[in-house]
Structures are given as C-alpha cells and as structure tokens.
Amino acid sequence: MSIIRKEVIGGQTLILGDCLEVMPTLGRFDAVVTDPPYGTTQCAWDAAIPFAAMWGALASCIGPDTPVLLFGSEPFSTLLRASNLRRFKYDWIWDKPKATGFLNAKKQPLRGHEIISVFYERQPLYQPQMTKGVRKQTFRGKHLQTDVYGEMRGDYAYDSDQRYPNSVITFSSDTQNSCYH
C-alpha cells in the first residue's frame, strides 16, 4: 500500500495516496464525497480513474445506504453515471460564480457549473436545507362555486416562505486575493 502522507486536521484524517489501494483498508464510510480527475485536459495528473476499479475499491467501504457523491464535468460525468446505473440516483448542478475555460472562450461557452452525481442503493439520510422563497397566497376552503369566481367560501392564507432545494445549487467559491503555490 502506498500512503504518501497522513495528516489530522480538525479531528479529520486526510490521507494522500492511491485511493484504489488505500480505500479497502479504511473500513466503512458514512458518506463518500470526492472530486476525482476527469481526464479532460492534457495535464499528466488528469487521468480518469478506471470506473470498474473505483467501484470495486468502494464496495468494501460503503453500505447500501451510503451516499457516494462524485464531482465531474462532461463527458466524464456521463461515463461515470453509465458505469453504475443501478446505484445512480440524481445529479446536483453546482452553479459556480466564477466560470472556467477562458482559453477556449472563443470556441465554446465558459463552464459555469459542475455536476455532482449521487449514487446509493437504499435511501440514505436526507435532510434538505430549506431556502427562502416568496410567500404565496393560497385559497383554503371546502365550498367553491365558480363561473368565474361565483360564491366562494373559505379563506385566503399564506404558505410558508420556506422552499425545498432544487437540483441547481449555488455556493460562493473560496476565491482568495492572492494564491500561494
């Protein structure tokens, strides 16, 4: 096994190494959230992980209700979803405030979003983070006769302004005024 480096930060252990070798040694996870290389650039480090090997390594770490969230972009995300259709459930679309791909701006649109594909076998714990919306006026009542608003009994009420999240989420990026490399 090739663990290159291990650090504990804020009570969490971060391991730098080959995930295909390290994951099977770690036990069960409550969730897996990862941003693997997509294989979409010419960078030496940007080689897509072999999906069959990845799912094989994950098999020892996840249970049927363990959510696996994998960040990606096209065409990587399509191939990723197709690699495990049985467990694929849905995508989140991360609307990014800062687009990327400026070198290709004259050839194709800037990339202003990232795909987060969600996989699991059984429904895991889901606690939706409600968002604030507009309070809507609704009619509540039992008797309603209308030929364009003839006799109506009941009352108007306002629904909550809390809304369930949709599949497009926006988070600000951690942009720094200066970067250190």
Regions found by a protein language model. Name each.
Residues I3-H181:
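Core catalytic lobe of class I
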